[in-house]
A protein has these predicted regions:
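Outer membrane beta-barrel
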Residues: 95-135, 139-273, 292-305, 310, ...
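Gram-negative bacterial Sec-dependent N-terminal signal peptides
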Residues: 2-28
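N-terminal periplasmic/intermembrane-space "pro-region" immediately following the signal or transit peptide
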Residues: 28-128
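Detector for outer-membrane/organellar transmembrane beta-barrel domains
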Residues: 306-425
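Solvent-exposed, glycine/polar-rich loop segments of beta-barrel outer-membrane systems
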Residues: 125-146, 282, 325-329, 367-376
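Outer-membrane beta-barrel "beta-signal"
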Residues: 437, 463-475
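Sequence/structural signature of outer-membrane beta-barrel proteins
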Residues: 120, 190-195, 224-228, 233-239, ...
């Protein structure tokens, strides 16, 4: 009994001793886990704080960037809106090339290199060596027997030159207020008097255009406002329909509003004075110019344009004047004329070019000066303006986008004063056909045949045949 009691008593004691022995270990283990857990929590809290700090910095940077963008947009909104530039027309520079130019100034360089190869034959005599008519068609220079011609057919004369190559420079500016200003300059190498064909074929630079503009105003040298350059058909020749075309460049002041333009242009009077030898009966005509005009030539033009083409009407009123104190010549007259013409787009492959002009005292404007504006009658000391009727028509047909042809007819007739006699030009006319091939953009290769006739007052005629090849690279 006592033994069983002792045994029973020992079991709780053993259990108590066991608990007492392992309790510190258990407590120690719990404390270590808690510390490790606390350390991990602390590390997590540190990382969270770092993320919070980083997020705050990024938010600050984003806010600053948004502020900067807003400021830039505000500045851009205050600047003038730049004009939309068509594809392929982007400027080569962003900043101004010319240091002295106003901000926003653009510079454009252009022109072409043109080489011409001509074979010419005339029926009634030779064109003089280095004559202008050897390089381009001048209908007034076509020889006629008794009027600058021998009456004998010439041999074929061959000429080659590159003097019609040209270079131009355009400068344009639009101010913050929207005002437009700029200038244009163009030259070629048609200075015949400064060169020859002996060794280097050096020719002088000649001025074609030199003008400035400001909004609706233009001042300087360019095409006459009386002329419609846009209606000219394509030709290998320098002009093409020379016989019947208005073709003048001169200094002027011009105002343009929409399709209307008015200009005051440089005056110049061309004269012919006829004399008859009382013994032989032979007539001679002496050409001269007079820049004694007191009034500028007044020109007006109105034009329309659309998908159908272009059409315009023009007028000129001018003073014809001679004033030479040495000879005692002192006379003046009023001359004037009208013109209309344009370009009719007949379809995707065909275009019709046309012009008709008429008046008295406007011969200087027609055909590169086929004859004079007026006759000067020495005996009466008076001017008798020359009447003129001129025109041309040209048809253009495109076989393909790279191959095209032109057929052109031009003519002008003159009503001359009787004091000039029978040797003055009565009419000129020509017909030409050409073909052009464009193997790649800006490159043109062409061939052209031309036949022209000049008739004088007594009915005699002389003709000219010309075959011309041309190459051109535009830039």
């Amino acid at each position: 009994m006592s033994h069983r009691l002792l045994k029973t008593t020992r079991r709780p004691l053993a259990a108590a001793l066991f608990v007492a022995l392992i309790a510190p270990g258990v407590a120690f283990a719990d404390t270590a886990k808690e510390k490790a857990l606390e350390a991990r929590i602390a590390e997590l809290e540190r990382q969270v704080q770092m993320l919070v700090n980083t997020s705050q910095q990024q938010q600050t940077q984003i806010s600053q960037a948004q502020t900067d963008v807003t400021a830039v947009k505000t500045v851009q909104a205050q600047q003038p809106v730049a004009a939309q530039v068509p594809a392929g027309k982007q400027p080569i520079q962003v900043t101004t090339i010319t240091p002295g130019a106003a901000p926003g100034t653009t510079v454009k360089i252009g022109g072409f290199i043109k080489a011409d190869f001509l074979a010419t034959q005339t029926s009634d005599g030779q064109l003089a060596d280095d004559a202008t008519g050897r390089a381009l068609y001048l209908p007034g220079q076509t020889p006629v027997a008794g009027a600058g011609g021998s009456g004998k057919r010439s041999d074929v004369d061959y000429n080659a030159h590159a003097k019609f190559s040209r270079f131009n420079l355009g400068i344009d500016n639009v101010s913050d207020a929207g005002n437009k200003a700029g200038a244009f300059f163009e030259m070629d190498f048609f200075g015949n008097s400064l060169g020859n064909q002996t060794a280097t074929n050096t020719y002088g630079v000649t001025l074609r255009h030199a003008y400035m503009y400001w909004n609706n105003w233009l001042a300087g040298q360019t095409w006459s406002n009386f002329m419609d350059a846009a209606s000219l058909p394509e030709a290998a020749d320098f002009v093409g329909p020379t016989d019947g075309v208005l073709f003048v460049r001169q200094a002027q002041i011009r105002y343009t509003q929409g399709g209307f333009s008015v200009a005051l242009e440089n005056p110049e009077t061309t004269l012919l004075t006829g004399t008859r030898n009382p013994i032989t009966g032979a007539w001679t005509n002496v050409a001269s110019n007079s820049d004694r005009g007191a009034l500028p030539d007044l020109t007006l033009r109105y034009g329309w344009k659309g998908d159908w083409g272009t059409f315009g009407v023009g007028a000129v009123v001018r003073q014809l004047k001679v004033d030479n104190q040495a000879t005692g010549a002192d006379a003046d007259k009023i001359g004037g004329g009208l013109t209309l013409g344009g370009k009719w787009v007949m379809g995707s492959t065909d275009t019709l070019h046309y012009q008709i002009s008429g008046g008295e005292g406007i011969a200087r404007y027609v055909g590169l000066g086929v004859t004079a504006d007026t006759a000067y009658d020495v005996a009466r000391d008076e001017l008798n303006p020359t009447g003129v009727l001129a025109g041309y028509v040209g048809w253009r047909h495109a076989f393909t986008p790279k191959l095209r042809t032109n057929l052109i007819y031009a003519r002008s007739d003159y009503d001359n004063d009787g004091s000039l006699g029978p040797l003055v030009t009565k009419s000129v006319q020509s017909i030409r056909g050409n073909i052009f091939y464009t193997p790649m953009p800006k490159v043109d290769i062409g061939a052209e045949y031309m036949y022209g006739v000049r008739e004088i007052e007594d009915g005699r005629k002389g003709d000219i045949n010309r075959l011309q090849f041309t190459t051109k690279y535009s830039f």
